[in-house]
């Protein structure tokens, strides 16, 4: 069914999560299935399923969900979850119930998944805010294009898009009139305003518009719709570009939002935030069947890093004792010439 496979990219079979959770709260010898001459207990089921890939992912999701609920539970409201739920339901329309069923979800279990995702999202954004530096602001400013006024044509067919582009290239062609006639958007909307950090317009469209001068028209831009998995085709004309101010601090608030949004999409950064939360929760794996579920977060957390740095310092001290002259030479060199890291370190920007 259309869209059903894209309900939640990160969701594993929720039935497995529930089954594993049930195993924690039910006596191991509780019989869940009886048959002639035999029974299946909770323990039987647990041992049979715990090594499967689905159960491994389910346990990982369960751990992360519990940890973030404990640490950030008061940061996400029921209203936020409901809003996200209804937005997804609207996107799927009449196929939403079928999509839920195909993903082994109910409205309530889906809402729990949304809540878990939003808790992690909150933690990632807060971590990104704390790490903002002047250097990052300046880098973001270099690639930033202020507000652009554009006219955009949206089409469903590549051949049609190419044909429309040829019309637009003809001498005396009226872009606005052609756009209103050809675009497939609701209410024939063709005028838009956005900057280079916009997230409500396809990334490739934003990039194309940012590279154009006033009056410039793009080639056909092909974009895969993340909801329908159908390609859309765009042609944009930049009608006006705001002049870029010379001081990056004039855009500080907007640059901050862009930097945080980019970090929030960075999987490496997300993993570091999750690793720190797991460290703080002091998560210990008691069943060796799940020994590797947190492997992707190994050596990323602050505690792990601190332990590693402590070990390195200890080894350096031991080496210094064995060869004091070399140690003194290294210290003198360090004092005279700052490291590259020290030279580039910036104070966090004011929040």
Curated annotation (Swiss-Prot):
Primary localization: membrane
Keyword set includes Disulfide bond: no
Lipidation (S-diacylglycerol cysteine): 23
Keywords assigned by UniProt, alphabetized: Cell membrane, Isomerase, Lipoprotein, Membrane, Palmitate, Rotamase, Signal
Region called Disordered, residue ranges: 303-351
PROSITE patterns linked to this entry: PPIC_PPIASE_2, PROKAR_LIPOPROTEIN
EC number: 5.2.1.8
Reactions it catalyzes: [protein]-peptidylproline (omega=180) = [protein]-peptidylproline (omega=0)
Residues with a covalently attached lipid (N-palmitoyl cysteine): 23
InterPro entries reported for this sequence: Foldase_PrsA (IPR023059), PPIase_dom_sf (IPR046357), PPIase_PpiC (IPR000297), PrsA_foldase (IPR050245), Trigger_fact/SurA_dom_sf (IPR027304)
GO function term, MF aspect, one: peptidyl-prolyl cis-trans isomerase activity
The keyword Signal is annotated on this UniProt entry: yes
PpiC domain location: 145-240
Amino acid composition bias (Low complexity), ranges on this chain: 303-317, 326-351
Intracellular or extracellular location(s): Cell membrane
GO annotations of cellular component type: plasma membrane
Primary role: Plays a major role in protein secretion by helping the post-translocational extracellular folding of several secreted proteins.
Family statement: Belongs to the PrsA family.
Protein name: Foldase protein PrsA 1
